[in-house]
Design a protein with these regions (language model features):
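Buried hydrophobic core positions in alpha-solenoid tandem helical repeats
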Residues: 1, 40-41, 82, 86, ...
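An alpha-helical repeat/solenoid feature that recognizes helix-turn-helix modules
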Residues: 4-29, 48-75, 79, 92-132, ...
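Conserved loop-to-helix junction within protein kinase catalytic domains, corresponding to the end
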Residues: 180-182
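Asp-box/WD-like beta-propeller blade repeats and closely related beta-sheet repeat scaffolds
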Residues: 36-53
Length: 184
């Protein structure tokens, strides 16, 4: 591990650092001579990003797409592999959960996956169909007050994740309403 303190069990640490370096105007492919994109995503030193659940796969895809990074043909974890892993782990009825064996969706994870997959919808009909199901279940999850919950706790973080997901799909979040109350 070239970065003291970065976990080799949680690839999202690498992905968050990638985003932070990029946001600060740096180059994640050369941080002190180390390549966070290669080591944290497509040749992931922490192992298969999907081993950290949907969070790992989604954030690996977000890191790769954050600046349109090229992925070598011989890479272990390509965009295609990450997308296929995500699509295979959709819960019945649409959406995703952090846990690969869960049978019900988690709003936060579903929203993260939506904005990770959004750039790939136009090039892959399976991605678009999966996103359509996810958007439907997110619309179904809105409370009477227009909020979203993580578990049974309505909170601004879950609502913010859904807002990001909706806008990544070109949907104005103020147009998504609860069917019974009409609130958004």
């Amino acid at each position: 591990n070239p970065f003291t303190g970065l976990s080799t069990n949680t690839p999202t640490e690498w992905h968050r650092l990638t985003m932070a370096v990029l946001a600060a105007g740096g180059d994640p492919t050369n941080v002190g001579g180390h390549d966070l994109i290669a080591d944290g995503t497509y040749n992931c030193l922490a192992g298969d990003p999907s081993n950290q659940g949907m969070n790992g796969a989604a954030w690996a895809l977000l890191a790769l797409d954050s600046n349109g990074y090229e992925v070598p043909a011989e890479a272990e974890y390509t965009r295609e592999k990450l997308i296929n892993d995500i699509l295979k782990k959709e819960v019945p009825g649409g959406g995703w959960s952090m846990n690969d064996t869960a049978r019900t969706l988690e709003v936060d994870i579903t929203a993260m996956v939506v904005y990770a997959l959004a750039p790939h919808a136009s090039e892959n009909p399976d991605v678009q169909a999966t996103l359509d199901r996810a958007l439907k279940v997110l619309r179904d999850e809105i409370s009477e007050d227009g909020d979203y919950a993580s578990g049974s706790d309505y909170n601004c973080e879950s609502t913010a994740q859904v807002i990001i997901a909706l806008t990544s799909m070109g949907i104005d979040p103020t147009t998504v309403t609860n069917a019974s109350s009409g609130k958004n």
